[in-house]
Regions:
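Conserved phosphate-coupling serine/threonine residues in phosphotransfer and NTP-handling enzymes
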Residues: 4, 102-104
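Asp-based, Mg2+/Mn2+-dependent phosphohydrolase catalytic module
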Residues: 106, 110-210
Length: 210
């Protein structure tokens, strides 16, 4: 989702800084680069990285405040939606079931879908915040829940690739996102290029039987 459909890092940083000030737990200002550096990690790991000066209990307390502030802020203000996302999803939806799996907190995907009014394009969503499962487990869970026979995951960082392998699905790299992949896989230069991939059969070719 992050680095694939949009870049929310700047507004996430703004919202977390608001939450930090309100909490009074520490004096710290996060940057967009700080947030980009932890994109794709589970929320507990993010708290450990960004708030090492706090005890575990205090980190998790602040994390909860940050996540709530973030969800509310993004629902209202959004982030940077990559070019052609809505149009590309509309075309792909005619041929495929579309799903979102993320390591984010509960409510983050919903805030994204609410702001951009993209609910109609997705058949199901799942995230770490709902069940504390790792991304590979959630990809498999969602595939099983929806009776998928084959699937491919589009992601931007190495952890996404590892999760897709764990889940037994194919992988397409969003090369315009936040990371690189240490293997040879189909790579997108833009999200819109998925339509070209589809015309060439690249999406179908990247799928793996489940």
């Amino acid at each position: 989702m992050d680095g694939t459909l949009w870049d929310s890092a700047e507004n996430v940083a703004k919202s977390w800084n608001e939450a930090i000030v309100k909490s009074g737990l520490l004096k710290k200002e996060l940057t967009t680069a700080d947030i980009q550096g932890v994109m794709g990690k589970t929320m507990d790991v993010i708290a450990d990285i960004l708030f090492p000066e706090l005890t575990k209990k205090m980190r998790m307390s602040l994390l909860e405040k940050c996540c709530q502030e973030e969800n509310d802020y993004l629902r209202e203000h959004g982030g940077i939606l990559y070019p052609g996302v809505a149009e590309t999803l509309a075309e792909l939806k005619k041929q495929y079931g579309l799903y979102i799996v993320s390591n984010c907190q509960k409510g983050y995907i919903e805030a994204f879908l609410d702001h951009y009014k993209l609910w109609d394009y997705f058949s199901d969503i799942e995230c770490y915040g709902n069940n504390l499962l790792q991304k590979g487990e959630n990809i498999r869970l969602l595939a099983t829940r929806n009776g998928l026979k084959k699937a491919v995951y589009v992601g931007d960082i190495q952890a996404d690739y590892e999760a897709s392998k764990q889940a037994g699905v194919g992988f397409i790299h969003a090369g315009y996102g936040f990371g690189t992949i240490d293997d040879t896989v189909p790579e997108l230069l833009t999200f819109e290029e998925l339509l070209t991939f589809n015309q060439r059969g690249t999406i179908e070719g990247a799928m793996r039987e489940l």
